[in-house]
Structures are given as structure tokens and as C-alpha cells.
Amino acid sequence: MNKFLIALLVLATLAVSFSQEIGVSILKTDTPKGECKGKTASIGDYISLKYVGKFEDGTVFDSSEIHGGFSFNFTIGERKVIPGLEIGTINICEGEKRSIKIPYQLAYGENGIENAIPPRTDIYFDLEVVSIEGAPAQPFYYQLIPSVGTIIAFSMLAGFIVLVKFIIKRYPDESNSKKPAPGKPKKTKAAKQN
């Protein structure tokens, strides 16, 4: 019974910790949802945008203008930029202007960047999409190759199954282990009568 309560407590703790999702907030957009007239960005698309990166107080820490006014280019999903920027550009429209807030967990983390981004700092971006190029079509057999995440998930599942089997063998259910075999009734010694 105690093991059951401990397991239940651990599961409840995990459920609460996973329910507190961290996400990117869209603060402002000039394109209402569902009214995109051009291309919409998705994972695998090559996106080109102009940006201004700011802290909460409005201080600019980076922008396209600082880099000569050139647009910034990346492929969504390649993990070459901070995760929050990739998440914040999913479903953005070509030509759209969008302001987003990225929590520090999806930006520069606990430590920040020395002399540039303070530790545990949420950041804000004003984005303007210049262009979106769709991802090139992949051959069908490429789509069958599992990702690293899928392989890790299946490995963890296999490990969990092995662990459960080990626990079941190591700690059998005691209520079932003392039952007599079916068939002949068990003989008991009768008390001697004089």
C-alpha cells in the first residue's frame, strides 16, 4: 500500500510539472488569424525576416539594422537559432509584422550571454517577414527514417517495459502465490479420537 501511495505522489508531481508549459507569446500582429493572403511558414521552410530584439524595458540588444539592414535567414526546425524564435515564426505569413515575447527558457537560458543578455531574461522581438520559401520535397523513403527523438522515445519505452518485467518477477503478488493447486483437495491431519 505504501509503494502505491509513493508511486501516486510521484506521478502527481510529474503531472503538475509538465502541465506548466512554457511558450512563446504573440503580443501583436497585423494579420489576424485566418486572414493570411500569402505563404504561411511551417517547419522546414526557409524564412527571411527583419527583426529588432529588445529587453522588457525597450533596450535594443540586436536588430537587422545593426547588421547592415540585411534580412536574417534560417530554416525553421534546423535549430540554428534560439528555440523561441523558431516557435514564434511558425504559422507567420509572408509580409506579416509580429511582436513576440520569448521566455528565457526558450531564449538564452539560465546564464544568458556575458556582456549581452543578462541571466534569466525574457526577450522580445519585433519581426517582419520578407519572404518564405517552402521546404523542398523529400523522397518518400526519407520520410520513413525515424528521427533521433523517435529512436530515443522507443528506447525509453523498451527500457520501461524491461523495468516493469523485472519488478513483476522480483516482487510477485503474494495473494496469488499461496493458493493450492487445482484438482485434489489438500489433505489435513484429523485430530485423533479416543
Curated annotation (Swiss-Prot):
Domain (PPIase FKBP-type) ranges: 44-133
Compositionally biased residues, Basic residues: 184-194
Full protein name: FK506-binding protein 3
Protein keywords: Isomerase, Membrane, Rotamase, Signal, Transmembrane, Transmembrane helix
Disulfides per UniProt: none
Principal location listed in the UniProt entry: membrane
Region (Disordered): 173-194
Record GO biological process: asexual reproduction; chaperone-mediated protein folding
Location(s) in or outside the cell: Membrane
UniProt organism field: Dictyostelium discoideum
Any single GO CC term annotated in Swiss-Prot or TrEMBL for this entry: membrane
GO molecular function (one): peptidyl-prolyl cis-trans isomerase activity
Activity control note: Inhibited by both FK506 and rapamycin.
Entries under Gene3D superfamilies matching the protein: 3.10.50.40
EC number(s) per entry: 5.2.1.8
Signal peptide positions on this chain: 1-19
Family statement: Belongs to the FKBP-type PPIase family.
Catalyzed reaction equations: [protein]-peptidylproline (omega=180) = [protein]-peptidylproline (omega=0)
